[in-house]
Every structure is written in C-alpha cells, then in structure tokens.
Amino acid sequence: MSVLGVICGLAVAPASTSPSPPAPAADSGCFTIYKLQHEVGAETYVWSRAAGGRTLTTRWAFRYLGSDVRLETTLETTDDGRPLRLRSLGQTSTLTDVDLSVELNAARATVRDRGGTRTEPASGEVFPIHHYPPVALEEALLRFWLARGRPAAVPLAPAGAASFELRGSDTLTLAAGPVVARRYSVSGLLWGRQSMWATSDGRIVAVVNGDAELDRFEAVRGGFESQLATFVRAAVRDGLEELQAIARRTPPVRQGDYAIVGARLIDGTRAPPVDDAVVVVRAGRIAAVGPRGSVQIPKGTAVIDARGETMIPGLWDMHVHFEQVEWPVAQLAAGVTTARDVGNELELAVGLRDAIRSGRALGPRMLLAGLIDGAPGGLGVQLAGTPDEARAMVRRYHDAGCEQIKVYQSVPPPLVSVIAAEAHRLGMTVTGHVPTGMNAFQFVEAGADQINHVGFVLAVMTPPPQPGQPRAPVDLASSEARRAIAFLLEHHTVLDPTLARSEENAHPKDSLLAVYEPGAAKAPPELAEVLNASGSPGDVAARRMAGLARALPIVNALRAAGIPIVAGTDLVVPGHSIARELELEVRGGFTPMQAIQAATIVPARVMALDGESGTVEPGKRADLVLLDGDPLTNISEVRRVHAVVTGGRMFLPAPLWRSVGFAP
C-alpha cells in the first residue's frame, strides 16, 4: 500500500504475443511510485469508452519530504488509438507544475500552456504529451510507436520528439511465473534517457529515470514491486554504458606529457597571479609551475599556447546529487573536476564513481556521503530506527568506500550521536541537514562535522520567534549571532550554504530562471521546461528573495570569522550553477579570489585532499581550468571555460555540453 492509501498489488496479466494494438477499450492499472527506492505514492489509470473513441484518465499522488504532489491527465483518442486531445493539470514534482491543453485537428495542434495559446502545424503522427509525464501516458505513447511500425522518432506536441531504443530483455521472476519484459532506453520525454520495461503488447512494467526535480524516480506496475532491485540494477548498467559511449565519442584533445604556456595563472594559494606562466603536466600530475623564464620544459614535450587565457585550479562542487548519468559530464564541461555526492542511490553513486575513477567514463572525481534518514517519511532506503541499524548503515557505506555520512532531516535525534561516533571510529566525517527536533548547536554537539544549507545556521543566529510570528532577521551584532559564530569556530564546523539552490526556490515563478541563472537558457528543452516552472509565487517570492539578499552578507561574515565555507550547488542547472554559487558569494562580499578558493583549496582542505588538489602546485593532480577571461576582474568569467583538465586529460567543453543536450 502506498503512503496515500492506494493499493497497487494488482494481478499480473499475461503478455500478449500479438502485434501491438492500441490500448483496450476498458483497462485499468496502478503504478507504485518511488523516490530513491522509497515508496512515496501511486499512479492510477483507467481507459474508458467514449462516443467515437476512448479516454485515458490517469492520476498520480505522492508525498515527498512533507509536500503533496498531485497530477491529473486525460487523453482522448479515436478507436484506433489516434490522439485527439490532451489535458494535464497539477504538479510534476514538489517544485514544478503543469497546466497544458493540446488539441489535434486537421494537421494542426492548438496548444494552451503558461505561454498562452498558439496553433502550429502537426501531422497525424504527432502525439500530445508533456515532459516528465505520467507513466500511463507514456504507455499510450509506446503503443502509438509500436502500432506505427517503430519509427525512428515520434513528433510530440507541444514540442520535441521521442525515440525508443531496445536495449535487451529481462526475465522477471514473479510468484505467478516468469514474465519477459523488453528493456528500452527512451529519450525526448525528460532530460537524458529513461529506462523503460514493457511486455510485448506494449504494457509498461516499470520506468527508472531522473524526475522533474532531478531526483531518482522509479514507477513499478502493481504486482511487479518485488522486482524493483532488478530494475534499479539494469538502469544503472545501461546508464553507465551510455556514459562510457559518451567518453568514446568525446576523447581528450590532449593527454600524457605536455606544457601549457602563456596563460595568466591564479594558482589558488592567495599568491599574486603569474602572467605568462608555464605549467608542465606529466603522467596526470603537475610536474612544474612558474613564470616562463623559471620553468624548463623537457625536450620533446608538446606545448599548448594559452596566451590570452587565465588558468585556475579545477573547481570543486561540494553538494551534488548525480541521480542520472548526464550530470557528471555537464559538471566537467563547466570546469568541475571534483564533486561530493551528498545523497543518492548507492548503486548509481558507486557505479559512477568507479567508472570515472577507472577512466571508462567522463566526470569529476567523486567523493561520496552515504545518506541515512529515519522513518516515516524518510528519504531513500537507509532508514535508521535503532542504534544497531544506524551503526550497520554507517558500516555499509564505509565498506562501499564513502568518505562521509549524510544525515537527513528525519533521523531520530538520539541516533545522530550514534551515527557520528561510528563514522568517526571508521575514519569518516559527518555532514547533513539538521534533523527535525534539533538545532544546529545540538547537531554539531552530537558529532556532526559539517552542515548543508545556510538556513540551519541562520536559525540559531536569532532569538526563537514568538508563536505565529516570523523569525527576525539576523543582526550580526546580536548576542545570538556572536554566540553562533563562536560555537561554529570552536567546533571547526564547515558550511556549504547552497545559495544558488535558494535562489532557484525563491525567484518569482512568473520570471524565467534564466533571468538569474543564464545557464538555464542553454539547457535542453526537456530540462528548460521544468527549470522555468520553478520558483515561488507573488508575495512568497518577494519575501524569499529578500531573505536571500540578507543571507549573502551573513555568509561572508561567517567566512571572515574563519568558518570554512565551501561552494556547493544542490542541483539547479547542471554544470552552470557552480558559477552562480560563486557569483552570489561575491555579491555577498567575498572577493573573487575568496570565492574561487571556496570552490578549490577550501573544500580540498576540508576533505583532507589538499595534498592532491585545490591549488596549482607541483606534485598535485593536474586538475585545471583554462578560462577566456579574468575571474579576478569579474567572477562571472568562470563561465567562459576554454578547456578543462582532469587528471592530466584535457577536454574542450563544447563537445561535452552537446553530448548531454546543452548548447555550448
């Protein structure tokens, strides 16, 4: 039973061996919805006969992190399955909504959405569907594709095209007997690819993908829930194969031994920039660094002319969730060479980390923080309810090679100290959200080393609000603020404030995100649609944006007091938002150099990897970024990546961006 009381334990119908017809005139079903393999709700659907055709009505309802998500969609078709009209109203995630009508008539499509009403040419082979759609609507699209002889692509209305690639078949072992499901890789319905399983008559069994808020999402037909682990493993395997194919299609433009000559070097150490610098790369490491006249380039070494460019250390993003395989490629294109994943499905996170580490796949070097939450309403499947369960989860993550534990907000407060003690015993550190029932002081006193999101810190910098009243703005001269800063300093607490994520949530919903984050304008249309549906309405947006404006100088004050501030994005626009994080830091009072250090040497030091990364110095990994501009003059120049070097392998960003659907 789902958390909303919908039962999906339906009988499994035998697969038909006949050619794929349209959906039957009368049919119904249910899909259990999961986020990070944790059941959160269900989608139900019914096909009914109407005058001259059939109607699909599908509803999904789930509860995620305290928010309800509901969506209702109707599709009207002719008896032979040709779509006539679509209506979809509700939410595609806790952050995004849809209000769409499409009517197909006489080679025209009339579309009504947030952009108004428009009429466009459309052939009879167009299918009406929005991005991040309900599963039953995808099933109608799959049957449409099968009935038309499996064309290379199906044009969609309002926009785009969908394609299906058969990846293989999986035998699913059920109590009633084995069921063979075809496994497809589907593109065009969301950013990246979706894994889909269907019987031979086009009946969808399961889908696995990133959803409209870029979380890992699974939907499984009633009766097939026991096969969730099979679907998860196969989706990871296919995703990693696609990531490796991207690596084969976008090889490095330089690797091995070479020298980069003529760039202006910002080495990240606080030393003044070096004009006309030379950096010698040998076997993936920095062999020599200095002004041109002081560095001898070994005979026979290839030389790269970087005059007019600026070199900085490879960037770190300390708050990522690589919940689909396209993420690490986008991050690398933006100059991120090290990323900390702070909450993911372990199967995917470990698979990505290992594939990148081996050189089979492209992306930043990954550090992992294993997620632990509590029930009910927790995130993921590692839900601790007892000390023994908590310790076992920490050990599992340690054995998987995780550097940290990520505590989430439903962990019972008494278990935080248990988790921290076991993590510290094993040489791991602890980061996370402050759980419900605790404040930041209690969280740190229980053993947390780091805090995600500035809001948890701001909450202890002001007096508790009166019942029914908003919290007062932070006054840095107040005793509460001074006490909080002294406490964090005493405990060496690290903060990743995630300012870009705060802006995404706060900005006015009637303004495109690209007004604030220009990278959103380069996103593929499937992703741009949900990015531009983000934000807050009216007065809520004004209040939240004002709160963000007040928070920026407070983050700078924390940094100035000596509290380590590390740059982390928490999703938003893949790749681009690390630059937005630095821009917001500078707006709050960081110098450009301080912002660069928050994304280089400070996180390297925090993660005890400053001997390997974080600055451009001999002996360290050759993780470098060449920029067509000077970020010390304008921090936004970090967006102008000319080339990125990871472990000595140099890549141009444009092919990387294109490989995951972005405009360069």
Language-model regions: role of each:
Residues G66-E138, W191-S195, S200, V205-D211, ...:
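Contiguous hydrophobic, core-forming segments of folded domains
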Residues P24-A26, V40, T92-V180, T230-R237:
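Solvent-exposed helix/loop surface patches that form functional interfaces
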Residues T173, R248-P252, L265-V278, P291-R292, ...:
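Acidic, glycine-enriched loop/beta-strand segments at the rims
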Residues F217-G262, Q296, G647-P664:
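Extracellular/periplasmic ectodomains of large secreted or surface enzymes and adhesion receptors
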Residues R270-I312:
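Histidine-rich, glycine-flanked metal-binding segment
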Residues M393-V411, V457-G588, A654, G661-A663:
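Active-site neighborhoods of metal-dependent hydrolases
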Residues P328-L348, G363-I372, H398-V411, T429-T431, ...:
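Divalent metal-dependent hydrolysis catalytic cores, especially in the metallo-beta-lactamase
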